[in-house]
């Protein structure tokens, strides 16, 4: 067994119950979040209150922000990467579809400032995909784009080139279970193992290949692996703190990239609560938070338009469940750990905390209904965030919203 060695930099462990969103820590935190949002976020309180109210199922656009806020980060470090990201007002997130010539041309011709794409050459069936040529075309477009590579650093995916035919859960030992949300072929990993990290950080690893193809940075998925129950069990067995190890891991990825490309960006998907740790904040440039207001089910069933509870007080109430459409209610009932059992208020607390520390915020909601889409764009932008909406599978090109 090889585990990444511990260094002099250590963190205060976080209670496991808090990581899982359970127990008295969460209950006591609800009132605290409401108070802190009002007290801490001077200049953002009004917009945050409106966003917490959210769209009602009957009238999603009945409440809209009355003014647009500018994110303020008085203590933020003005790095080249954050300067580049601050210029992004429209972005595309497309990883569930093959990048055929027609799709690439639509992206090239679009007014998007940034696009997040899967690094297709890492897929077993796409090893010859001309990724570098596509990146160059997007850079050279009439409206040039930042091109960011999507990577899953907390799960092994059985369709990637690194996957070996004999691998299964428990062999190698750092593959610890199945995806808890039902995404087939995805397996949470004990990400602190050298064998896993070498796949990414090796001399000919995935990160170097991404940089060689001209990408402008990384979009890190499954940062939340530290909260997966199988990962937690493995961490306890190995005597490590999964939160600490994840921050070490993100810092290692960030250091690798920025030592070779100082203006390349690091965007972390979800896990906004890690913004409480300054060591984590220093390693990333932005957070992209999924389903702040709307979600869809795994495997795109339903594809979206399931509103989250607007406040902590509404979580898991009968009134909230009754307000859902039939497909969304099935999703709610089938997965007690889904985002439909978390409030927009909780997400907004951590996002605004991160924003105050100088982290740029992108939002990813899953909705197609025009009223819901319009409401999210207006609400997210009023908070100083940069929104994007699509299907849960992120499998279609979406035209930019002005």
Which residues make up each language-model segment?
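Short hydrophobic transmembrane-like helices used for membrane targeting/insertion
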Residues: 1-3, 11-12, 36-37, 63-69
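Ser/Thr-rich, Proline-interspersed low-complexity disordered segments
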Residues: 48-79
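Compositionally biased, low-complexity intrinsically disordered regions
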Residues: 6-7, 58
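Bacterial N-terminal signal peptides that target proteins for export
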Residues: 8-12, 24-35
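Bacterial N-terminal signal peptides
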Residues: 35-47
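Glycan-processing catalytic domains of CAZymes
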Residues: 73-402
């Amino acid at each position: 067994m090889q585990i990444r060695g511990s260094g002099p930099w250590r963190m205060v462990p976080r209670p496991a119950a808090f990581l899982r969103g359970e127990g008295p820590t969460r209950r006591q935190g609800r009132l605290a979040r409401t108070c802190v949002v009002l007290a801490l976020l001077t200049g953002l309180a009004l917009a945050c209150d409106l966003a917490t109210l959210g769209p009602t199922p009957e009238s999603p656009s009945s409440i809209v922000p009355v003014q647009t806020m500018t994110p303020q980060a008085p203590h933020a470090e003005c790095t080249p990467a954050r300067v580049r990201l601050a210029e992004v007002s429209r972005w595309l997130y497309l990883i569930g579809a093959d990048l055929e010539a027609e799709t690439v041309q639509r992206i090239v011709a679009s007014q998007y400032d940034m696009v997040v794409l899967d690094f297709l050459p890492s897929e077993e069936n796409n090893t010859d995909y001309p990724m570098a040529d596509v990146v160059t075309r997007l850079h050279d477009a009439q409206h040039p784009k930042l091109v960011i590579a999507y990577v899953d650093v907390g799960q092994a995916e059985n369709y990637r080139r690194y996957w070996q035919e004999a691998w299964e859960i428990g062999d190698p030992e750092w593959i610890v279970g199945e995806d808890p949300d039902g995404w087939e072929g995805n397996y949470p990993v004990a990400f602190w193992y050298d064998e896993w990290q070498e796949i990414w950080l090796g001399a000919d690893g995935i990160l170097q290949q991404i940089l060689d193809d001209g990408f402008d940075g990384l979009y890190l998925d499954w940062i939340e692996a530290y909260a997966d129950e199988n990962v937690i069990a493995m961490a306890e067995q190995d005597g490590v703190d999964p939160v600490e190890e994840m921050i070490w891991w993100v810092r290692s990825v960030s250091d690798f990239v920025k030592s070779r490309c100082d203006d390349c960006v690091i965007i972390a998907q979800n896990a906004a609560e890690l913004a409480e740790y300054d060591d984590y904040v220093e390693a990333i440039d932005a957070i992209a938070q999924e389903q702040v207001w709307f979600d869809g089910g795994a495997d795109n069933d339903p594809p979206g338009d399931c509103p989250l509870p607007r406040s902590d007080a509404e979580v898991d109430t009968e009134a909230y469940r009754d307000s859902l459409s039939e497909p969304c209610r099935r999703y709610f009932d089938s997965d007690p750990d889904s985002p439909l059992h978390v409030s927009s208020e909780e997400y907004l607390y951590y996002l605004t905390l991160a924003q105050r520390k100088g982290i740029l915020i992108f939002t990813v909601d899953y909705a197609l209904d025009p009223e819901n889409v319009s409401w999210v764009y207006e609400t997210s932008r009023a908070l100083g965030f940069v929104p994007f909406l699509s299907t849960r599978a992120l499998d279609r090109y979406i035209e930019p919203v002005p």
